């Protein structure tokens, strides 16, 4: 069987199916974490790494041939913005609405109103929260936690189009190897591969996303 299913309008059926399975895994992992039953799905966070790989696969297949044929970096960024930002905005605003509702019903259960609003505005712009609180901890995106992975994916997209899109395979292999070594170090240091969602592990997410994304590009 081919590694990809039948292709329709450059969409791979098999990858779309795996994308859906991974999304469900991430959702179940977050639900399990909230219910303190994460032991039932201890490695569900690895679905995020699959998304990083998938992003590299899709972007390389969809855009590599277009550079030099009328598409430049600005056009690429605009296309990605149109593709991704509606989801960012919807998630951040929905999370903000939930926190505001909690504030109205039980103010003590959420942060002060000013901090809730600041977090909502920053997260809606895909900007990590620069400080935390006793209630939200050190989360980068307290209004919509999963946005952290999209933030790092966007960074990978920008780095790829600015630095790597026209580079040959040997250089990409070097980048992959360096990222793998750094990622392995971070896993050993933190005792887990589940890094990147808070300020304590912010920099550890960089080799994590780089390894997955570049691996996808090479595929």
Where are each of the predicted segments found?
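Active-site alpha-helix of zinc metalloproteases
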Residues: 25-26, 75, 148-149
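Aromatic-anchored segments of alpha-helical transmembrane domains
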Residues: 24-31, 97-100, 178-191
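Transmembrane alpha-helical segments and their boundary/interface "anchor" motifs
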Residues: 45-48, 52, 64-125, 156, ...
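Aromatic-enriched alpha-helical transmembrane segments of multi-pass intramembrane proteins
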Residues: 16, 70, 115-219
């Amino acid at each position: 069987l081919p590694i990809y299913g039948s292709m329709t309008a450059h969409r791979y059926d098999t990858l779309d199916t795996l994308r859906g399975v991974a999304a469900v895994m991430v959702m179940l992992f977050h639900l399990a974490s909230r219910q303190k039953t994460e032991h039932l799905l201890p490695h569900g966070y690895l679905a995020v790494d699959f998304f990083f790989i998938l992003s590299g696969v899709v972007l390389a297949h969809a855009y590599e041939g277009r550079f030099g044929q009328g598409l430049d970096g600005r056009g690429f960024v605009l296309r990605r913005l149109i593709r991704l930002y509606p989801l960012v905005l919807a998630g951040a605003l929905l999370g903000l609405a939930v926190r505001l509702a909690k504030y109205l019903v039980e103010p003590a259960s959420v942060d002060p109103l000013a901090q809730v609003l600041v977090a909502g505005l920053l997260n809606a712009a895909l900007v990590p929260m620069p400080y935390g609180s006793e209630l939200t901890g050190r989360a980068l995106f307290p209004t919509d936690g999963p946005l952290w992975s999209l933030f790092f994916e966007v960074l990978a997209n920008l780095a790829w189009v600015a630095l790597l899109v026209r580079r040959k395979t040997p250089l990409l292999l070097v980048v992959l190897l360096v990222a793998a070594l750094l990622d392995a170090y971070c896993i050993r240091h933190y005792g887990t591969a589940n890094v990147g969602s808070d300020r304590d592990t912010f920099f550890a997410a960089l080799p994590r996303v780089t390894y997955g994304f570049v691996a996808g590009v090479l595929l």
